[in-house]
Each structure stands twice: as structure tokens, then as C-alpha cells.
Amino acid sequence: MVAIVIVAAVASSAVVVAVASTTAAGLPSYTNGYQKWPKINKKPFTKCGPPCAHGGVKNVYANKKKVGARYPNGTVIVKSIAQAGDKPSRPNQVAVMRKVAGRWKYIEYQLSGSRYTVLAQGQLCQSCHARAKANDYVFTKR
């Protein structure tokens, strides 16, 4: 959802004309606009696993490029996961990796109604991503 906030001052009172958020409800603000970030994958893909934690049609976006073999601190990687036939702009799952102080933080969200809620996070995600250590714990390659 794209946001525009317009405020008009009228005789010492403010009137909000339109308010919306640039983040889908429930997703962290640091993922704002992720669908406009460069994609890591060339085209949507369905390949998964084993084991398969993210089944569906996937696109992977990163806000920063690798520096050598590693992603820099502050990198956010978002994997949007839609089921076949669903709108890619409204994925039913969103997996997020965020690099802080040299370590990845993981969290996966599930669409529940009009809001994303936490599905999995932390060690559960990290144990699987350990298999991609050679690519800085990221399975998808450019």
C-alpha cells in the first residue's frame, strides 16, 4: 500500500486529508517499498528444498548488493511468497532477513486477513540457512 499524507493548517487546526502506510500491515518498517528493490532472482521461481520452508511462487529482493562474498550490515532481504494464481503484489507469506552487527536476523510472516503475523523466526530459520553458509546464508544467488 502506498502512502500519502497531506496536512492542511486551517485557523490553528490541522486537517488530515489522507493517511496510509507504506508498509503492509504487520511488516516491519525497514521493509518499506521492498517490491521496488533489485531482485536477486531473474524471474519468479518455485524450486524449494529439501526441506521446503517456503513453498509457492517466490521473488527475492535485497536493499543492498554483496560486497565481495558477503552482504554488508544493514542489508535487508525480503522473499515474497505467493500461491499460484494469487497476486504477486499481495504475497501470502513474506520471509525477511536483516543483517545486524555481522549476523542475520530472520523472521517469516503469514498473511492473516489483511494483516501479516509472525509465522516463524530466529533459530528455526537459522538452522536451515546454515546450509547456505558459503553464500552468506542466502540461498538465492544473483
Q: Could you describe each region identified by the protein language model?
A:
Residues 14-21:
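Signal peptide processing junction and immediate N-terminal pro/mature segment
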Residues 21-53, 64-142:
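Sequence context surrounding c-type heme c attachment/ligation sites in exported
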